[in-house]
Regions:
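Sec-dependent N-terminal signal peptides
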Residues: 4-13
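Patatin-like phospholipase
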Residues: 18-97, 105-372
C-alpha cells in the first residue's frame, strides 16, 4: 500500500511540474513582453541621445527662434530680437505663426529690426486696422462691431443665397506682403533663405498643423494670418488653410523637427479671459482660445528658453502702444539674459537687405495670379 501511495505522489508531482512547463501564454503576458521591449528600446535611445549630447561642441549647437501669433502685440517680438542681436546670438532656424510668421519671415530674409518695425506699421495702419487682421486677440463680439465688418450675402441668378467664407477678404494684404517680399518671390524652398524658415497654418479640413517649407511665401503668410470667421480661408494645393494659432500658436515642435538643438520661444499669445455674458461669436472665440492655450502649454514646456512678454493688458487693436510692446519684449528677454548668454554666438554679421525708404511706397501690379 505504501508503494502505491508513493507512486501516486511521484506521479502527481511530475504532472504539476509538467503542467507548469506547458502553461499557455496569456494576453497579459504578451502585453508585458511588448512593454518591456519598448522600455528597452527607449532606454537604449536615451543612452544614445545622452552620448550625442555629451559629444557635441557648444558652438556647434543649432538654435531656433520661435515666434507666436498675437496680432499687433507682435511688436513685442522686436524687443526680443534686439536683445538677441545685442548678445550676438546665432539663429539657425526660425518658425512662426500668424504675426510671428511675418516677423520671422522678414528677419529670415535679412530685414533689419528697424525695417521690420516699419513693415508692421504699414500692415497695421494701412491694412490690418482696416481689414481686421490685427484683432487676433480681440473677442469676436468686439470684432463684430467694427465698422468694416458688414456681413454680406451672395445671390446667384436663381436667387439662391450663400454666406461668405469670412467677413473680410485678404487680397489687399496679400498684395502688400507680395510687394514686401518681391526680391524673394523666385525662392520657393524656405530652406534656401539666409535663415531656414517654417510658416505655420492650420488645415481647415483636418485640423492638423501644417509647417510650410516651400511655396508662394506671400500666400502662405496670408494663410497663417487668416483668422477664422474674420478672413476668408486660403486654398493652397487643394487644401484649405486658416490661422496657425488654431492648431499651433507656438511652433516649438516644428523647430526641433528642423534640426534645432536649442529653442528660444517668444510667446505673446492671448490668455483665457473670463466673461460674464456670452453670445455665439464670443463662444466661438473662447473655444478657439482655450484650444490654443492647451496646445501652447505643452509647447512652452518644450522650449529651452521661454520668453513671455507681459502684453495681456495692452489692447490688441491699439497700435499707439507699439513702443510699450517693444519695450515689454525687451524686458521679458532681459529676464532670461543669464540663459541667453549661454547660447552659441554668431561668427559673422547678419546680412541686411536694402532698407525701406518710404513706408508709403507706391507700387504697380501688372498681373495678379491668386488661385482660389
Amino acid at each position: 500500500m505504501k508503494k502505491i501511495f508513493f507512486l501516486i505522489y511521484i506521479f502527481l508531482n511530475f504532472s504539476f511540474a509538467y503542467s507548469e512547463n506547458i502553461e499557455l501564454k496569456s494576453r497579459e503576458d504578451v502585453e508585458i513582453e511588448n512593454i518591456e521591449s519598448q522600455i528597452k528600446v527607449l532606454e537604449d535611445k536615451i543612452q544614445t541621445i545622452k552620448k550625442l549630447k555629451n559629444n557635441k561642441n557648444k558652438d556647434d549647437l543649432k538654435v531656433a527662434l520661435v515666434l507666436s501669433g498675437g496680432g499687433i502685440k507682435g511688436y513685442a517680438h522686436l524687443g526680443v530680437l534686439r536683445v538677441l542681436e545685442r548678445e550676438n546670438i546665432k539663429i539657425d532656424y526660425i518658425t512662426g505663426t500668424s504675426i510671428g510668421a511675418l516677423v520671422g519671415t522678414l528677419y529670415s530674409i535679412g530685414y533689419s529690426i528697424d525695417d521690420i518695425e516699419k513693415v508692421l506699421d504699414i500692415i497695421n495702419v494701412e491694412n490690418f486696422l482696416e481689414t481686421g487682421s490685427d484683432t487676433t486677440n480681440l473677442p469676436l463680439d468686439k470684432k463684430e462691431s467694427l465698422k468694416k465688418y458688414s456681413l454680406y450675402v451672395n445671390f446667384d441668378n436663381e436667387l439662391n443665397f450663400s454666406l461668405p467664407k469670412g467677413l473680410k477678404g485678404n487680397r489687399e494684404t496679400y498684395l502688400v506682403v507680395k510687394n514686401l517680399l518681391k526680391n524673394y518671390a523666385n525662392i520657393k524652398n524656405f530652406d534656401d533663405f539666409p535663415i531656414p524658415l517654417r510658416i505655420i497654418a492650420t488645415n481647415l479640413n483636418t485640423g492638423e498643423t501644417k509647417a510650410f517649407s516651400k511655396g508662394d511665401i506671400s500666400k502662405i503668410l496670408i494663410a497663417s494670418m487668416a483668422i477664422p470667421t474674420i478672413f476668408e480661408p486660403v486654398e493652397i494645393d487643394g487644401n484649405t488653410y486658416v490661422d496657425g494659432l488654431v492648431s499651433r500658436n507656438l511652433p516649438v515642435e516644428e523647430a526641433y523637427d528642423m534640426g534645432a538643438d536649442l529653442v528660444v520661444a517668444s510667446d505673446i499669445g492671448a490668455p483665457i479671459v473670463k466673461k460674464d455674458n456670452y453670445n455665439i461669436l464670443s463662444v466661438l472665440n473662447q473655444i478657439s482660445t482655450i484650444q490654443s492655450s492647451n496646445i501652447t502649454k505643452v509647447s512652452r514646456e518644450k522650449a529651452s528658453i521661454l520668453i513671455s512678454p507681459d502684453v495681456k493688458d495692452i489692447s490688441a487693436i491699439d497700435s499707439s502702444k507699439k513702443n510699450d510692446l517693444i519695450n515689454l519684449g525687451k524686458v521679458a528677454a532681459e529676464q532670461q539674459i543669464a540663459k541667453i548668454k549661454e547660447l552659441p554666438k554668431s561668427s559673422s554679421n547678419r546680412k541686411i537687405v536694402k532698407n525701406i525708404e518710404d513706408k508709403k511706397e507706391k507700387f504697380v501690379i501688372n498681373k495678379i495670379e491668386y488661385n482660389k
